[in-house]
Amino acid sequence: MEIINAVGRRKTSIARIYLSNGKGDISINKTSLEKYFPSEAIITLVKQPLQQIEAIDQYDIKINVKGGGFKGQAEAVRLGIARALCEVNPSFRPSLKKEGFLTRDSRMVERKKYGHKKARKSFQFSKR
């Protein structure tokens, strides 16, 4: 199998996934998954698509990710891995889609408006 490319995005994070046959090594920005993400919960979030199709130790994954924070990056990586797995084998698609791993979360931070403190919060109103 050749290398499969996929892209995942979430908020301002962009993850580029390079998936190939292997022993289950996952490296993010040339470091191991466990070193890159501090929390065990985030690591399990990244591995969810592989656990869903029971292929934890079948593919080597190299990931380049930039932008955002840990959570946004992890969700971008999860989407990218799910998309790459669908390219490898289209029969994975129904189970991944059912769990919602193929849905791009389109929510972004709302921009700050002038005359307001934040996106929607106004300055304190003084009647007199």
From Swiss-Prot:
GO terms for biological process: translation. Transmembrane segments: none annotated. GO terms for cellular component: cytosolic small ribosomal subunit. The keyword Nucleotide-binding does not apply. The keyword Ribonucleoprotein applies. Belongs to the universal ribosomal protein uS9 family. This is Small ribosomal subunit protein uS9. It comes from Amoebophilus asiaticus (strain 5a2).
